[in-house]
Amino acid sequence: NSHLILSVFLESYMFSAVALIVFLLLIQQEEKPLAHLVPAGLFSFGITMTNFIQTCILFFITTPRIKTIFKYVLSVLILAVFLAFIQDSLYPSSDPFYRPLSYSQEQDYRFNLFEAQPQSVGGRANALARSMLMFSVVAPQPLILLEETGCSFPCSMVYYFDKDGVYRISSYEGFGKGLVFGWLILLATAGWLFFKNFRVAPKAFALSTALALTMLFNFTLHMNYGDDFMLYSPDWTYALVFFFGISYESFSEKKWAQSMLLIFLLGLMINNLNLFRELLNAVLPFYG
């Protein structure tokens, strides 16, 4: 659902997903020239450095050549520093990434796991897990908030952190509840198929392993950083969708599997478009 919303804006979050998908496709080619991989890595680095780390995970797991990976990382970093230096020369007000002061504001988005209350840590883990595995695919009922978050205009969220340090998380109702239940069954089956095949031929499923590790990386990262998971969802949803598709690759020619997936996708479209109806109904009285 966040992709439908963010895709209508010129936002770096959507380009973030594009950069990762491009890199993912490049490393699947038989020939992996650095002349192609470095620009893709630089593109992802320019959007967010954490996504560059994802490219390193994908590269290392699928192509475990230390020397090649070292050249890739070094080339991207040298080019990134050079381009950032040029930008700083042309626009002195910019904050290049190699200056420690440029990260001072990031402290505002940090979540300290060691200082937070246990209920806050557990609530954040629950909200993040739901955002990654459920909300990024099947839209829940949005929370329409006003005084709860100090909004004078309806604020739509899928979770919020209240004054008592408790995460209030949106849920599913009616058709959406059945749809997300079906999605979780399909996702659990995809995970089972992955582990089953990985035990037999781990090298053949290196890409699925890399995708799973990038999702784990994102979970670890955002347990410690970020205040709105929806904004970062493109950074892990691409991995979730590719992991899901690869797991069911052996069923791709089965008519019954194609029919089931088509029915699920139609249901997903209906459910996720309902999110926009809920949002429009919430703001309509303010334009009456």
Regions found by a protein language model. Give the residues of each.
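Hydrophobic transmembrane alpha-helices of multi-pass, membrane-embedded glycosylation machinery
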Residues: 22-24, 53-65, 234-238
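Signature aromatic-anchored transmembrane alpha helix within multi-pass, membrane-resident enzymes
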Residues: 252-273
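Hydrophobic alpha-helical membrane-interfacial segments at the cytosolic entry of transmembrane helices
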Residues: 66-90
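Membrane-interface alpha helices of multi-pass inner-membrane proteins
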Residues: 33-64, 75-79, 263-265
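Aromatic- and kink-enriched transmembrane "portal" helix at the membrane-lumen/periplasm boundary
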Residues: 1-18
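Lumenal/periplasmic acceptor-binding loop at the mouth of the active site in multi-pass
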Residues: 109-194, 211
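Specific aromatic-rich, kink-prone transmembrane helix
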Residues: 15-34, 239-243
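Transmembrane alpha-helix segments characteristic
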Residues: 202-221
